[in-house]
């Protein structure tokens, strides 16, 4: 599906997106999904997973503030989504900073996410390569991680998105790049995490590669628009949500190459 068709479908269908994300990201992730035209649900109790995940259009998992109870919820939700062909997105935030986090990320990856999203350092580290990441921030270039992305796509049958100044997307065969956005985007905490939630919304409406591409493009368009109106990171966040809501479908194709 073309990006403009996916944005139209997302707004028409208003899919329910199950977001298991981190404490820092919950508010902005929910608002990003709402602004785009979908419906977020921040459900993470293990006791609810079996009933809730199956009624959602997509699942997103972000390990930013993972703990043992949340890990149980993530694994159960991922297994449910995979078993019931519900698209799901994995964001292995800073998985390289501890043994616990690395093991959790690898266990989730083994569940074969529909889309894997990360920065260059996170994607490199998933293949065992040493990156230069600092916490949740990347110290590696998107270009340097493209080979790792293709390897992961082939190994796990997933679409891999590397986010950065110019985003890169591959399913192991097809490739795309998305430009635009703003240097203010990394200055708003958890904005990148909220993109994972947006990818889930798009994945509920169309094929995985097309959905990830549309989500990347929507973010870049909104970032560019918001930057023209913002005085700094605080006002940028406000204008970014407005820009997501007001993005016209035809604009998405303008940032894709």
Swiss-Prot record:
Its cofactor is Mg(2+). This is Hydroxyethylthiazole kinase. InterPro entries: Hyethyz_kinase (IPR000417), Ribokinase-like (IPR029056). Keywords: ATP-binding, Kinase, Magnesium, Metal-binding, Nucleotide-binding, Thiamine biosynthesis, Transferase. It is an enzyme of class 2 (transferase). One of its GO terms (biological process) is thiamine diphosphate biosynthetic process. The keyword Transferase applies. Pathway: Cofactor biosynthesis; thiamine diphosphate biosynthesis; 4-methyl-5-(2-phosphoethyl)-thiazole from 5-(2-hydroxyethyl)-4-methylthiazole: step 1/1. The keyword Kinase applies.
